[in-house]
Each structure stands twice: as C-alpha cells, then as structure tokens.
C-alpha cells in the first residue's frame, strides 16, 4: 500500500513539473541577451570557431582505446581463475576493438592532421 503512495506522489510531482515548464515564463528575446559578453564591449569577431571533425574522430578513437586499456589491465587476474566465460568475453571485446581499428585504418581516420 505504501509503495503505491510513493508512486502516486512521484507522478503528481512529475505532472506538476511538466505543467510549470509548459506554462513557464517565456522571456523576450533580445539581441543583447543572445550575444556573447566581452567585458561590456561589442564582440570584435564571431565567437564561434569552426569545429574540426578530425579532432572529434581523434577524441573518439582515444576514448575507445582508453576503454580497451581498462579491459586489458585485469586480464592476468582473470587468467588465474581459469574461467572460460571471462576469457571468451575478453577475446570477443578485443576482437571488436581490433575490427574497429582496421576500419579506422581503412578510412584513414588515424592520419595526422594536414
């Protein structure tokens, strides 16, 4: 019975929040509020710099191989337990990461910036 009370309170709070957000204050949009602030001066140039897609790819590759290091480090301890399920899962994860590396080499994502 008390479980349903918690759910009911949660749903009422969610509905009230949705109501408040939908009826919330819609402020006037002004040029000054949407422009970047540079110590009270008008901006000299466009504040948005173009984003390098190559930099994004390098960051994603770094994250993938960082996760691979986290997977590889405990492998000697897993081998001591001699559990085949852990060994197969480790091999499968590393196989997927090697396939990703080959894909990156094929599409030259790992070349240096030109």
UniProtKB/Swiss-Prot annotation:
Reactions listed under catalytic activity: a ubiquinone + NADH + 5 H(+)(in) = a ubiquinol + NAD(+) + 4 H(+)(out)
Keyword field contains Plastid: no
Domain of life of the organism encoding this protein: Eukaryota
Disulfide bonds: none
Residue stretches spanning the membrane: 1-21, 55-75, 85-105
One Pfam family of this chain: Oxidored_q4
UniProt GO MF annotations: NADH dehydrogenase (ubiquinone) activity
Protein keywords: Electron transport, Membrane, Mitochondrion, NAD, Respiratory chain, Translocase, Transmembrane, Transmembrane helix, Transport, Ubiquinone
Its EC number(s): 7.1.1.2
Keyword Translocase attributed: yes
Enzyme class label: translocase
Membrane topology qualifier: Multi-pass membrane protein
One Gene Ontology term, aspect cellular component: NADH dehydrogenase complex
Cellular compartments annotated: Mitochondrion membrane
Family from the record: Belongs to the complex I subunit 3 family.
Function: Core subunit of the mitochondrial membrane respiratory chain NADH dehydrogenase (Complex I) that is believed to belong to the minimal assembly required for catalysis. Complex I functions in the transfer of electrons from NADH to the respiratory chain. The immediate electron acceptor for the enzyme is believed to be ubiquinone.
Protein name: NADH-ubiquinone oxidoreductase chain 3
Organism: Rhipicephalus sanguineus
Gene of this entry: ND3
């Amino acid at each position: 019975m008390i479980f349903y009370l918690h759910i009911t309170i949660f749903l009422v709070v969610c509905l009230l929040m949705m109501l408040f957000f939908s009826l919330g204050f819609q402020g006037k949009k002004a040029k000054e509020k949407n422009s970047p602030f540079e110590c009270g001066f008008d901006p000299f140039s466009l504040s948005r710099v173009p984003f390098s897609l190559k930099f994004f790819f390098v960051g994603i590759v770094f994250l993938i191989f960082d996760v691979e290091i986290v997977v590889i480090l405990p492998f000697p301890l897993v081998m001591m337990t001699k559990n085949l399920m852990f060994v197969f899962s480790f091999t499968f994860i590393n196989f997927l990461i090697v396939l990703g590396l080959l894909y990156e080499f094929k599409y030259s994502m790992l070349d240096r910036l030109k």
